[in-house]
Amino acid sequence: MFRLLASSGQVSLRPVLLQHVRNNKHGLGFPNASGVPQSPSSMTSSSIVSPSQFTRSNSSAAGLSESPASSVDSKIENFLSKSAKDPLVREALDAETKNKLNYFKEQIDLAHRYRSIHDHDSERAFASTLDNLSRALEDESLRDTFVSRDLFSYAQVLNSGVYNNRTNRLSGAKNRDSDQYQNQNLHDEVLLKQAVLHLGELITNGEFKAILNAPTLSFLFYSMKQFQLYPEMIHLWENGVNDQQTGQVYLDEKILAVILPVTFEQNRFTYEEILHIYELNTEKLDKVGHELLTSMGKIAIAAGDYSRGLDSLESILQLYEKAQQSHYKNKILASLSDLHLSFIGTCKDIKISKHFFDKVVHYDLPYRVKLKVPHIQSLLENCYEQNEPMDNILYFWRASIAHYNTEQQLVLNSRYAILNNALFTIFFKKYPELNEESFSKLREIIAMYAESKPIDEVFLNTIIGNYSWDSKEVLEQIIENYDVYNVKRTPVSYRVCLKKTGSLESYSNEEILQKWNASLKHLDENKFTYIPVADWAALRDATILSHFKDARKEFYLSVLDKYKDYIQDHRSCIRFVRYWIKRKDVAADIARVASPEPQTFDCDIEIQVPQFRHLRKNINYVKEVQNMRFSG
């Protein structure tokens, strides 16, 4: 049974911010792209359909036939049952369980402590503590002792871990290779995801019903949302709504605020059904909280109901005006910011989006909005879909970069990468052919960026990665900018340039070899002792897996034959070979390189291995492959 609240009477607040949007009849004009603003110093619970249950890899199958050992099992169970009634045994068991609970609480405290310290050792200690907590949670006797606070604390630790791991991953300055085994963020992410799924599974299976509350569920749902576990979220929620004991918890405002946008995005419910759920669950409330108002505003904007979205924004503003405690006011401000960003990134009416965008970059708001790059990415994509002129798109792009440059705190490295990738994806769609206009516009964009901040590797990598013109000369001019602007390069830029040669037929094998050698030289100068998988991938995409593989296949095989022993180790070799085994079209060709007999390849140039200081042979490729074949 959906239990909801009654919203209070019609709001009367009409801030200037909203009036300008509602009363705008003449459109919102765009300045030139260079005009960048300056910064100051009928639904019931019975209609819910439950999908399939969470599955566990270690769960027992139901309905197994009785085995011959069942009588023995029965005797053991009988013995244990009688033993449990013994006071001494019971006391010992209680003491053991108490020790387990104390250990669990100690680990919770440690996790909070480690998470508050931002250094490498604390991150590793947190991961170890999280692993201890996850293992401890496997104990049913421990779970039986939990009170609401214990479950809440664990969910809180998970949510904190998910958020911090994501932040660390996005802010990392290092370009990690996929074959660097010490990628701890990836390891931690897998650990966190497993822990989140396990907790969701336990709750779905009916545990913790007596102690489950909305704050705990909120943390769990937020964690699941970060991992984009949308089907699992919807299933968990629908399963809970239909439970007589816990149904009301799942209809709490805070829970609806998290789950309703997901059900709309995943097409589980229509916009009208979402409104009906909202109305049923809010008709008896004196006021609706800012979290749910924000979510409903977001859904309304996504559905094109901008008037209701503005109503939600006004209602949140009213809550802010009436709020007394500063802590609560700050939470409301966060909701205002969140909904404001939705008008920028989700609204399909670019005039409305621009109005809200300008309010942020001109700092013309009674509340602070942190301009998040996914919303700008979405805005640029919406502009393209609405066939906005390129100059309008450039206005948003350049104003965003200028805005980020004014921020005092460290800007995440991923922010510019996402923003630039969105721009150049659109640029090469709008200008699919090289001509005077398109080339001039590209040069203009590069000059714009250089005026805003120094040309960097990520910027040039993004242009080259999206480059789609059939001109080797122009591509080489772009590549020259690494030197022109004294860009500090990482192995990534060399791989991007090498891979892009696979898109242009005009590159000869000799020119591709030059880029391969340049990449290896950089690796050697940076004390790499092996050729990473990422470099092998760039080479194959430029040659044997390119559109021009017939002319480049033998060249690739020749290079592979010369450098095959430079693969990192046994593990990387297995990974390398298994990739090619799946490619039936070239598997036989690759197998030639592993032949114990010398092979001759029909290559038009000679492949010579330079003298390296650090790069070296790490494996015997032929023996490795032979051992793999022998072991099956």
Curated annotation (Swiss-Prot):
The organism's place on the tree of life at top rank: Eukaryota
Membrane-topology annotation of the record: Peripheral membrane protein
UniProt feature, compositional bias: Polar residues: 53-69
Record protein name field: RNA-binding protein RMD9, mitochondrial
Main function: Binds the 3'-UTR of mitochondrial mRNAs. Involved in the processing or stability of mitochondrial mRNAs.
Gene symbol of the encoding locus: RMD9
Subcellular location: Mitochondrion inner membrane
Organism: Meyerozyma guilliermondii (strain ATCC 6260 / CBS 566 / DSM 6381 / JCM 1539 / NBRC 10279 / NRRL Y-324) (Yeast)
Main location (coarse class): mitochondrion
Family: Belongs to the RMD9 family.
Chain positions covered by the region annotation Disordered: 27-69
